[in-house]
């Protein structure tokens, strides 16, 4: 039997079982757990390569073959870190296994035919498109920025740069919901809208859900009172939608105990649960220990650095329409920014107590940095806390699975859309992101939406090949024309579907129905199920989890930073 060295094999077909790959310039390493390909029967496209007629490509018709095959990909997902070929059919993931020609090759589960396109993923990492569950729809240009960072789904609210939207993630009322759904129809990203949840009577909330709100948002700037919380959650239980909350920083209508009492045992998604983005001062972070609370972070506090506190004060004044000449407004801002709780947030993420990350786009958060900052936290916590059990010193597979779940499967589960997006699994939309390992979490090599390339780095258009400088991200065919409609999805609640809303608004995109939100608990958050007893000292702001003091020094230097953004 002919043999080649492990290095030569990795260079040709990508890493295999036992090989390790470093994630960009972080301290994180992954080890390949399983290889679905067959040694000696690997497929590869190119001159003199395998995927040729009668060799790795068979004679089957389009009905039997894949539309697209990603060859020899290193998949990193919550369920595993594996080497496989990925087959895409009709815009969805159809198979994960061994690609090739079943007429002449053994073990083929991803058939390649004359109607099959190929993306060479040898030496590349493939992840699910990210889900940003805290979007202020302030401007449509956020979509391009997010796509080029590896995010393919938005959950949030807004109507443009209105004062209300600059502060709160709400699309209020049926008229605005209709207009925003129509606007979203032409954006090459999956979208679900949140209506305004601040009401003490249910009728105005029900009409927003039947008008297309896939969830409701309670925000302190609209009054997150116990009455509004109770009413909103009551409607959510009735109509199977998720509720997100930004609680009362000033503790005017009650403290965290009152909010938790109003919530009861009902499921709720708490935004920026640390509190710098808003919420009961100084102890909203305690909510992360509740069995029915699905806690997320927004990215400006991730990770804790020497610049975090100073940056936040100015951001907060702008976003929440505060006046620096009014002493009470300044005190409000300062009450939200606490070094101790920000430092504890990173540790709670590493422990699996915080389940999700998100952006808070243009409203104290950066829409293009969800993926990047999540991995900066993972890196920083490895340096501070060492390997995360059951990982040893050889790889960080469990820590990597924990962190990737925070912006993929967990927000999908939280908002009832995990049957459509959130992981690299058969049957789901082929929203896939390819990364060169050296650029992981920073600059994708390709971003696929519904099986079609939506954005990619592209060189000089007049070049003789695609790679001459200047190279920058550009929209691709999957983001243009009617192709957008068949590769993107608008999420609606069942109540809107029963009404025939998609037909009423003449929506052309794929429609996904969000459901099952009310059954999701903290125990369902993949790799992030910890429910510690969290305590905050009201005088010093020190945070303890199950009695352990959570402290760490701010980072002075980070990976995935300046060296990647010189050009």
Swiss-Prot record:
What keywords would UniProt list here? Cytoplasm, Hydrolase, Metal-binding, Nickel
PTM sites of type N6-carboxylysine: 217
SUPFAM superfamilies the record matches: Composite domain of metallo-dependent hydrolases, Metallo-dependent hydrolases
The UniProt annotation places Ni(2+) 1 binding at 134, 136, 217, 360
Q: Which GO terms describe its molecular function?
A: nickel cation binding; urease activity
Which positions in this protein are listed as binding Ni(2+) 2?
Answer: 217, 246, 272
Name the catalysed reactions.
urea + 2 H2O + H(+) = hydrogencarbonate + 2 NH4(+)
Q: Does the keyword Hydrolase apply?
A: yes
Modified after translation how? Answer: Carboxylation allows a single lysine to coordinate two nickel ions.
| Highest taxon listed in the record's lineage | Bacteria
Q: Which residues bind substrate?
A: 219
Q: In which pathway does it act?
A: Nitrogen metabolism; urea degradation; CO(2) and NH(3) from urea (urease route): step 1/1
GO CC annotations, alphabetized: cytoplasm
Residue spans crossing the bilayer:
none
Family label: Belongs to the metallo-dependent hydrolases superfamily. Urease alpha subunit family.
User: Entry's NCBIfam families?
Assistant: PRK13206.1, PRK13207.1, urease_alph
Subunit composition and interactions: Heterotrimer of UreA (gamma), UreB (beta) and UreC (alpha) subunits. Three heterotrimers associate to form the active enzyme.
* Descriptive protein name: Urease subunit alpha
Query: What is the source species?
Result: Pseudomonas entomophila (strain L48)
């Amino acid at each position: 039997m002919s043999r080649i060295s492990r290095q030569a094999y990795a260079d040709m077909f990508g890493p295999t079982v036992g090989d390790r790959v470093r994630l960009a310039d972080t301290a994180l390493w992954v080890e390949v757990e399983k290889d679905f390909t067959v040694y000696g029967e690997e497929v590869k496209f190119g001159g003199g390569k395998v995927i040729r007629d009668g060799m790795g490509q068979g004679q089957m018709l389009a009905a039997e073959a894949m539309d697209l095959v990603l060859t020899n990909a290193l998949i990193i997902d919550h369920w595993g870190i594996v080497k496989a070929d990925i087959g895409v059919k009709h815009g969805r993931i159809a198979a994960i296994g061994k690609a090739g020609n079943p007429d002449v090759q053994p073990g083929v589960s991803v058939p390649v035919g004359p109607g099959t396109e190929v993306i060479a993923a040898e030496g590349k990492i493939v992840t699910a498109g990210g889900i940003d569950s805290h979007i202020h729809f302030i401007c449509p240009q956020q979509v391009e920025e997010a796509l080029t960072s590896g995010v393919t789904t938005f959950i949030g609210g807004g109507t443009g740069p209105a004062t209300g939207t600059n502060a709160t993630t709400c699309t209020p009322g049926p008229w605005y919901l209709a207009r925003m759904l129509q606007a979203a129809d032409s954006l090459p990203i999956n979208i679900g809208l949140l209506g305004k949840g601040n009401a003490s009577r249910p009728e105005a909330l029900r009409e927003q859900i039947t008008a297309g709100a896939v969830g409701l948002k309670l925000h302190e700037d609209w009054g997150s009172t116990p009455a509004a919380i109770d009413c909103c959650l009551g409607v959510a239980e009735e109509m199977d939608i998720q509720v997100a909350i930004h609680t009362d920083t000033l503790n005017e209508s009650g403290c965290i105990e009152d909010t938790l009492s109003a919530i009861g045992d009902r499921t709720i998604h708490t935004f920026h649960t640390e509190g710098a983005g808003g919420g009961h001062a100084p102890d909203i972070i305690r909510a992360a220990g509740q069995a029915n609370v699905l806690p997320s972070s927004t990215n400006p506090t991730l990770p804790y650095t020497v610049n975090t506190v100073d940056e936040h004060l100015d951001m907060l004044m702008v976003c929440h329409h505060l006046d620096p000449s009014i002493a009470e407004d300044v005190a409000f801002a300062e009450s939200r920014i606490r070094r101790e709780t920000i430092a504890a947030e990173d540790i709670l993420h590493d422990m699996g107590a915080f389940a999700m990350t998100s952006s808070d786009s243009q409203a104290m958060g950066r829409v293009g940095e969800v993926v990047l900052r999540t991995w900066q936290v993972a890196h920083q916590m490895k340096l501070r806390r060492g390997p995360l059990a059951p990982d040893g010193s050889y790889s960080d597979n469990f820590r990597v699975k924990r962190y990737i779940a925070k912006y993929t499967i967990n927000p999908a589960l939280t908002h009832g859309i995990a049957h459509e997006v959130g992981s690299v699994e058969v049957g789901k939309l082929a929203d896939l992101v390819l990364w060169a390992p050296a650029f992981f979490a920073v600059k994708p090599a390709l971003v696929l939406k519904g099986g079609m390339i939506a954005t990619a780095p592209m060189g000089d258009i007049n070049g003789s090949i695609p790679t001459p400088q200047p190279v920058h991200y550009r929209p691709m065919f999957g983001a243009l024309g009617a192709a957008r409609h068949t590769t993107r999805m608008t999420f609606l609640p069942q109540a809107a579907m029963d009404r025939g809303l998609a037909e009423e608004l003449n929506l052309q995109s794929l429609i996904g129905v969000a459901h099952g939100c009310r059954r999701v608990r903290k125990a369902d958050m993949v790799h992030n199920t910890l429910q510690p007893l969290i305590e905050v000292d009201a005088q010093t702001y020190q945070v303890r989890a199950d009695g352990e003091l959570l402290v760490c020094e701010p980072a002075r230097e980070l990976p995935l930073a300046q060296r990647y953004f010189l050009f």
